[in-house]
Structures are given as structure tokens and as C-alpha cells.
Amino acid sequence: MNGSKRLVAQLCQVVRSFICQPGTAVDLWQCAAGPHVFAKGSTQPICIVKLVHGQIYNLEFVYKYWCHILQSEKFPYSPVFIISNNGLAITLKCFLCEPMDLHSQFGRCLSMDTDVYLPKNTSVVLSQDDFTKFKTNLVFSKDLNVFNSMVVCRTYLTDFRQALQFLVVKAKNPKRVTAILGTIAQTLGLTPDTRSGEGGKNSERGEDDMVRRPIRAHRAGDSGGSPGTLPAEPQGAPTPPGGGLGLSSGLGLVRRWTRCAFQRYFTVLAVGAVAAATFLAGAKLTG
């Protein structure tokens, strides 16, 4: 039982630390650990996060981190994340495996897409291969792994419309973060792999690319119920040079931090907390 509580607490801490941008309060509910949580087809999520308007959620990063932890514990199933609208709130539910009776619990299941309109009693189910399938048409095959590209979700949630935008973030160059992670690793007594990709023209600025398809206009009979393009972000959101989603040195940091994690599992959360705060601190939004 103590091992179960420790694992549940660790998984919830990963969500709390990395799902949102630094400084953002996470409205998270954690389940009580018990045998039912680890059973195949369990309908009990490990945790539930209430999503709010105008935020970016690092879904693939957290999902892959969960996969690593569960593989280390020799857990036989892959986690499943479900974003659902029950009419009262939009929530992210994190399960250790696919729950039974998805349709009866979460209504109509929609596919991950660039733009998903999420009316009442609909959901988006995210499992092992969904992130790769989504990125296949957006990045080169060599960039499909989480070290080179990462899926994030931007929310647009109001009283009149609930919508999600799934975006792919690519780092142009990881060099800016290498020195930061090297300092962290030395402080913790780690010896991370110092190899990194070659730099581009913007390596000094550490800029990132956002790859996405254009928002589609509404068509009659569209299963997603898309009423048109998403509005621009609220006023005050800064626009990075060249447009796109600026997550400073994002994927370079993921690569460096994850390599440290694989080498020293029990210190990974300390490394990750500092490192993720570093690369997410420069996040900027554009409409």
C-alpha cells in the first residue's frame, strides 16, 4: 500500500509540476490510492485537472514522463489521458490504463486535431500512439520523438464556446539550455550526456517553431461542430518575433532533462522542476 501511495503521489506531482506554464496555479484533485486504481479498465483516474481559458497544457511531455515512471515500475499498461466536457467544466482526467465504457462515461469521443470544438458530453481520448499520429503530417519522421517535437494544447473556454487547439512545438536549437542543465546536473552530482544538435541561425536567441495547420471554417455537418475560426488570444498576450508559440529552448530542455532522468531516476523530479521552469518561463501566445 505504501508503494501504491508513493507511485500515485509521484504521478500527481509530475502533473502538478509540468502540465502548465511556470507560476500557473493548477486546480488538481488527487485520488485515494487503492487496488482499484491499478486494475485493468479502472474507471478511477489518478488525478483530475480543471482546465481554464487561455492556458497551454504540456500534454505529451507529461504523458511521456508518466510512461517512463510506469515502465520503471514494470506496470503492464499504458496511461490514457481524457479531456472531457460534462457541461459544468472541461477537465483532464489521467488514467493508468484505458477505462471501461468510454462512451457511457465521457460521451462522444473526438479525435485529436488542430482545432477541436468540445460541446457538452464530448471528449478527446489521448493514448500511446495518438501523439505520434497527430505529428506525422506536421514534422519530419526524424522529429517525431518527444526530444525533437512536443504536442501541447491551448484552451479557449468561455460560456459560449469550448475549444481546444493542439499544436506541435519544435525547438530550433538546444544549445542555450545545455549550459543551464549542465549547471543543474553538476549541482546534483549527475553526469548527463552533453551532446546536442547543431545550431541554427537563431541559436543565440533560442527561438522555437510552432507547426500547425490553418483553422478550418465551419461546414454543415462537421462532427466537431466548428463554428469558425478561433478568436485571438486575450489582449496583453505578447507576440514573439516571427509569430508562433515561443517556448524558449523548449525541446532542447526536454532532451537534456529526460536524459538526466533516465540516468538517475530518484533525482529526476528535482532536475525536472528546475529545468522545466527554465524553458517554460519564456512562453508567449499569439492568436
UniProtKB/Swiss-Prot annotation:
Q: Which residues lie on this side of the membrane: Perinuclear space?
A: 1-264
Q: Basic and acidic residues compositional bias: what residue ranges?
A: 195-212
InterPro entries under this entry? Herpesvirus_viron_egress-type (IPR007626)
**Localisation per UniProt entry:** Host nucleus inner membrane
> A GO CC term?
host cell nuclear inner membrane
Query: Where is it mainly found?
Result: host cell
Residues that span the membrane, as ranges = 265-283
Classify the protein's membrane topology as the record does. Single-pass membrane protein
Q: Annotated region Disordered: where?
A: 191-244
Topological domain ranges for the Nuclear compartment? 284-287
UniProtKB keywords = Host membrane, Host nucleus, Late protein, Membrane, Phosphoprotein, Transmembrane, Transmembrane helix
In what way is this protein post-translationally modified? Phosphorylated.
Q: What biological function has been recorded for the protein in this entry?
A: Plays an essential role in virion nuclear egress, the first step of virion release from infected cell. Within the host nucleus, NEC1 interacts with the newly formed capsid through the vertexes and directs it to the inner nuclear membrane by associating with NEC2. Induces the budding of the capsid at the inner nuclear membrane as well as its envelopment into the perinuclear space.
| Entry's family note | Belongs to the herpesviridae NEC2 protein family.
Subunit structure comment from the entry: Forms a heterohexameric complex with NEC1.
User: What is the protein's given name?
Assistant: Nuclear egress protein 2
Q: Which gene encodes it?
A: NEC2
